[in-house]
Amino acid sequence: MARVVGSDPETDLAVLKVNLTGLPAITFTQSDKANVGDIVLAIGDPFGVGQTVTMGIISALGRTHLGINTFENFIQTDAAINPGNSGGPLVDANGNMIGINSAIYTRTGGSQGIGFAIPVSLVVQVMDQIIKHGSVIRGWMGVEVQDMTPELAESFKLKDTNGALIAGILKGGPADRAGIRPGDILVSVNDKNITDSSGLLNLIAMLVPGQTAQIKLLRNDKAMLAAVKVDTRPRIQQPLTDQ
């Protein structure tokens, strides 16, 4: 009998506890050392036919803007992933887990050679927090952001599309209290450069609530600094039952 310890709707991950002893455990590898072209195996129960292993390669790393989860940093693979594979491990050629199979891109309902897995580095972060706190605690600044398109970059007289445009500010929120305004372009958080809006959200989420983050931004063609006291990201409630 498995008991739900906690879940994280924003990454579509959950931690289960099984009250049995002597069970074998999979070993983790470091997903940040994975390379495009590495051989991987996807394990699951596609369409309920029974445990199945499919082989492929890593097609891409750091996939974002897929609209699957709030926080995205997917491994893309061409290993056949079908309904029933979600939640199963993606392992390297040595059998070490590199990710958890999450979703596929398909127009037919079956595999088309474009599957996505949550990297084990993110899995471990979420797992550790759920075991410790029962949920995932993330940083939050109260901003609505969007990517810098080539058109926006041109209108702001920028040389490239790096950074994230502040489209909205929550009144009274951390960013508002720090003086950040709609129309500002955030370019770094604690000296970590921002490439796009997804990268900014991921950086903010990793901040510890209560700490002060140093933000570099552009306003009216001028570089500015802002100190933002990070708050706790509001939780999304998604009840789970024991299975």
Question: Predicted segments — roles?
Answer:
Residues G183:
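Conserved catalytic motifs of ABC-family nucleotide-binding domains
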Residues M1-N162, A167-K171, D176-A178, S197-T212, ...:
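Serine-dependent protease modules
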Residues L41, L186-V187:
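Short beta-strands and strand-loop turn motifs
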Residues V189-I194, N220:
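Short strand-turn-strand beta-turns centered on an Asx-Gly dipeptide
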